[in-house]
Amino acid sequence: MPNWGGGNKCGACGRTVYHAEEVQCDGRSFHRCCFLCMVCRKNLDSTTVAIHDAEVYCKSCYGKKYGPKGYGYGQGAGTLNMDRGERLGIKPESSPSPHRPTTNPNTSKFAQKFGGAEKCSRCGDSVYAAEKVIGAGKPWHKNCFRCAKCGKSLESTTLTEKEGEIYCKGCYAKNFGPKGFGYGQGAGALVHAQ
């Protein structure tokens, strides 16, 4: 007997999933809005899902719950924290002295080799290779690589730097260039500064 208008059942909520809202994973169907990590409830897709015993997790929560435990394992220096996994049902090991993260600020070679990331000079968030621009010798997100005054998008050849901030050449000249008669933005904007 044909199934007129029906669909598969959602692996999370059990209701009917119609084709337009269906996400398939591990032979099961889910509503897009139900395809969430079992722990943190983040939305998942084919690049972020990890499956264990018919349960779906984001890769981060899966690694915390089922990944290798101990010193030296983890997700890279950019995501270290002191969470020991109690909320995931992991019982902490009793040890006389817990491991402490390093305080050595020189992590660039480690970060390049093991997947950590440098920090953006504007917003302070991690900058990964796909979004990294180098300007004034420092890393920036492509979206943060803008003039600090006017917000104009910059290129490494069109920027000027002062005290750790980057500016377009026009804003740099207006704000930090020479002042007085004969200096400025051209004959139409001459001023006399005292």
From Swiss-Prot:
Principal cellular location given in the protein's record: nucleus
Record GO cellular component, one term: nucleus
Keywords: Developmental protein, Differentiation, LIM domain, Metal-binding, Nucleus, Repeat, Zinc
Protein name: Cysteine and glycine-rich protein 2
Alphabetical list of InterPro entries matching this protein: Znf_LIM (IPR001781)
Zinc among keywords: yes
Region feature Disordered, mapped onto this chain: 85-110
Pfam families associated with the record: LIM
Record motif Nuclear localization signal, residues: 64-69
Record localization: Nucleus
Record bears the keyword ATP-binding: no
Highest taxon, organism lineage: Eukaryota
GO molecular-function terms, A-Z: actinin binding; structural constituent of muscle; zinc ion binding
GO biological process: muscle tissue development; sarcomere organization
CDD domains in the cross-refs: LIM1_CRP2, LIM2_CRP2
General function of this protein: Interacts with zyxin. May be a component of a signal transduction pathway that mediates adhesion-stimulated changes in gene expression. Totally down-regulated in transformed cells.
Sequence ranges assigned to domain LIM zinc-binding in this UniProt record: 10-61, 120-171
